[in-house]
Amino acid sequence: MERPSLRALLLGAAGLLLLLLPLSSSSSSDTCGPCEPASCPPLPPLGCLLGETRDACGCCPMCARGEGEPCGGGGAGRGYCAPGMECVKSRKRRKGKAGAAAGGPGVSGVCVCKSRYPVCGSDGTTYPSGCQLRAASQRAESRGEKAITQVSKGTCEQGPSIVTPPKDIWNVTGAQVYLSCEVIGIPTPVLIWNKVKRGHYGVQRTELLPGDRDNLAIQTRGGPEKHEVTGWVLVSPLSKEDAGEYECHASNSQGQASASAKITVVDALHEIPVKKGEGAEL
């Protein structure tokens, strides 16, 4: 019996392929069927906040999904992400059974912003991502307000503000005392301490600390949070000359802020009044 030639085998394989192609294309078209806009589910009365997309068959309009909302999947509930986002399958599903492999029919994920870094909006607000900025802008426009645009990447710059001001202190000569102050701002502020001398007509002058004082030290460190700075004034031993008003002053390119507290020096503990100012310390 003669073996079939290579040419005959190739011709037979090509013929079989031609027979199978119409079957696959007809099954795909049968899934969608003719487009009938009248049978499409209605959109929300106020429209789609993130815009519209089309269903899997390209027929019915549907609302685009936002960040963190489900996407993918199969059937009528299939969702598509808004522009600037991508549908990401969970690791559990990717490691699951073969029938639930990533990209397979029926597999769903969540919409994730492609740009995953903070941005500064024209309203002075820092948004975790460009997608959240666009969503906020669309909400503003739906209320008849001005659109929000991206000013820059990263967090918005802001002037310093006092997180924890220094507190008034009462103590005896020879003691060790300290004042502390915590500030925040973007860029991170520069913190300095001044001793303020006031007269009858307001501030007379300020003395930048530590100056030439042997019993006074200044310490500053970043934190505890990002863009925060904490500073201390340590006085040891305390003398009568150290009494007065001390100012915590913070500044950056966006502005400045300050807060002050007083150190009161007495000769004996019994001289300290029972009721001191709110926030005062020994």
From Swiss-Prot:
Residues 160-264 form the Ig-like C2-type domain. Residues 1-26 form the signal peptide. Pfam families: I-set (PF07679), IGFBP (PF00219), Kazal_2 (PF07648). GO terms for biological process: angiogenesis; cell adhesion; cellular response to hormone stimulus; embryo implantation; negative regulation of cell population proliferation; regulation of cell growth; regulation of signal transduction; regulation of steroid biosynthetic process. Residues 105-158 form the Kazal-like domain. InterPro entries: Growth_fac_rcpt_cys_sf, Ig-like_dom, Ig-like_dom_sf, Ig-like_fold, Ig_I-set, Ig_sub, IGFBP-like, IGFBP_rP_mac25. It comes from the Eukaryota. It is found in: Secreted. Disulfide bonds join 32-57, 35-59, 40-60, 48-63, 71-87, 81-111, 120-156, 181-248. GO terms for molecular function: insulin-like growth factor binding; receptor ligand activity. The modification Phosphoserine is found at residue 239. Glycans are attached at residue 171. GO terms for cellular component: collagen-containing extracellular matrix; endoplasmic reticulum lumen; extracellular exosome; extracellular region; extracellular space. Binds IGF1 and IGF2 with a relatively low affinity. Stimulates prostacyclin (PGI2) production. Stimulates cell adhesion. Acts as a ligand for CD93 to play a role in angiogenesis. May interact with VPS24/CHMP3; the relevance of such interaction however remains unclear. Interacts with CD93; this interaction plays a role in endothelial cells angiogenesis. This is Insulin-like growth factor-binding protein 7. It comes from Homo sapiens (Human).
